[in-house]
Each structure stands twice: as C-alpha cells, then as structure tokens.
C-alpha cells in the first residue's frame, strides 16, 4: 500500500482529523471514492483475522477482575501452579480491544501474570465502537492515565501468584504510558517495554529507575521525531535502556489485525526481545 495512504491513516487516528476529512483525502489519494472504500479493510483492524492464543487455551486461565479500586481489566495467568512475574499490558488509543486481549494472553503463555488494563474504566469501560474509544482516550488526562498505571503496577506486585516484581509493556498510546510510568520513579515499576510510544520529556529522565526497552519503526516519522532528544537524555543520565529501530516497518507493526501496517518480521523479532528483556529483569 502507498506509504502516503498509511501516513494519512496515522494522522487520522492520532491527529484529530475527523472521519469525513479522512475519507475525502483518502479518495483523492486512491483516485476515487470507490477505490478508497476498497482500502479501508486493510487500514482498519480486523479482529477475526488474527488470534494467536485462543481464549480456551488450556495453558492459561483468564478473568476480568477489579484488581484495585477503579482498576479493571483482563487478567490472564499460566494454568500451572507457581509464582510468576507480573506484566501490565497497556493498550493503544482504542482501548482494551480484542487484539490487546490476545497480546495479554500471549504474555501469559510466556510465563507471566498479565493484566490488560482498561484505562477507560472510569468512563464505563472500553466500548465496542473504536471511534468512540479513541474519543474517550482523548479525554483522559496524563495524570489520570499515570494514576491508573501506578495503581495497577502496585496491585500486580501483591496479586496472588506474583513473585513480587512487576513491569509494563505498551503499544502506541500505551508505549507513551510506559515512558510516563518510567519517569514517575514508581518503586514498584521494575522494567518497561514501549512499542512506538511518545517519549517522556528529557528533563524528566533523571527520575527513571527501571530499565527500558524501546521499539521504533523506521517509517513512523511522527513518533521518531522525539527519539534523538530522549536517547541523549538517557545516555547523559546513565540510564539502562535498549533501543531498536525496525527498518521498513510502520507505526503499529505489532498489530496483526491491521493488514496495512503489520510486519510479521518486525513483530516476531520485537516480541522475542520483549520476552527476553522482561524475563531478565522480572524473573
């Protein structure tokens, strides 16, 4: 697919462009309204097309609890008895959707207690309508999102079966939430993985106490604009971090329900690095 079309979709989903304007511009790029409509299925998430770990997988067990006051979500753990490190899975700007639920199950299959937090809990929970979810995410203040993250991390350190260590992995909006959690200096936060997430202000970097793994896509100009300043601050302050750039990949390359932007090669490599990193620091 033409990169200009992918970039337009990114601006639409992250920059406040309304759907009418998006469709008009898409029609211009595609050549006609009819052609534009044929492109939409590849641009928008199709949850029926990808599910790596089914809900009934016998290796895991899932529930939808409130792990702390106002902290609801999707909790998945290995079926086998034992103690495990815990990971907060932070969703994109469309809420706790089927894709993020699948990612949460994948994390549990790797040997973690995984909690896909629903950051829209206070607004009634993630709706089925993704456009509505995106609007609701836009109403969340940074302080509200951070408070949710910190409460979730604190609860996960004490949840039944936890080894007492908790980290976080986030995607897109959730990647930015991981970076925000890192600069909060929360003592319960032991490791973070941010997939193409907005960077924290350089002035806040000295507060970071946990190691970070940062995944970026080479075609993601919007997010990549902040890398240089953030990395310079990480280096200057002697922070433990790994940064990987995935050549030829787009923002959201991990999302296997999005045909236009998913990159299996980048996603598989980033996932293996993510699991190894979290086991190193939380295991």
Residue ranges with predicted function:
Residues 135-158:
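Alpha/beta-hydrolase active-site loop
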Residues 151-208:
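Primarily recognizes the serine-hydrolase "nucleophile elbow" in alpha/beta-hydrolase
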Residues 214-216:
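Short beta-strand/loop motif that positions the catalytic acidic residue
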């Amino acid at each position: 697919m033409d990169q200009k079309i992918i970039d337009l979709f990114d601006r639409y989903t992250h920059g406040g462009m309304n759907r009418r304007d998006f469709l008009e511009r898409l029609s211009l790029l595609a050549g006609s309204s009819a052609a534009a409509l044929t492109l939409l299925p590849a641009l928008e998430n199709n949850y029926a097309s990808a599910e790596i770990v089914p809900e009934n997988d016998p290796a895991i067990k899932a529930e939808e609890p409130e792990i702390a006051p106002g902290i609801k979500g999707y909790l998945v753990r290995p079926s086998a008895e034992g103690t495990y490190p815990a990971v907060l899975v932070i969703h994109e700007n469309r809420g706790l959707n089927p894709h993020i639920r699948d990612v949460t199950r994948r994390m549990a299959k790797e040997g973690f207690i995984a909690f896909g937090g629903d950051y829209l809990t206070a607004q009634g929970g993630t709706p089925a309508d993704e456009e509505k979810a995106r609007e609701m995410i836009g109403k969340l203040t940074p302080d509200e999102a951070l408070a949710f993250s910190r409460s979730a991390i604190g609860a996960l350190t004490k949840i039944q079966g936890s080894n007492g260590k908790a980290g976080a992995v986030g995607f897109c909006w959730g990647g930015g939430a991981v970076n925000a959690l890192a600069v909060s200096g929360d003592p319960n936060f032991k490791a973070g993985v941010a997939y193409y997430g907005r960077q924290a202000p350089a002035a806040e970097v000295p507060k970071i106490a946990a190691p970070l793994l940062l995944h970026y896509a080479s075609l993601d100009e919007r997010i990549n604009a902040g890398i240089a300043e953030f990395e310079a601050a990480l280096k200057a302050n002697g922070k433990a971090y790994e940064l990987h750039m995935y050549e030829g990949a787009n923002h959201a390359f991990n999302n296997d329900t999005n045909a236009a932007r998913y990159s299996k090669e980048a996603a598989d490599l980033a996932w293996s690095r993510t699991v190894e990193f979290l086991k190193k620091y939380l295991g």
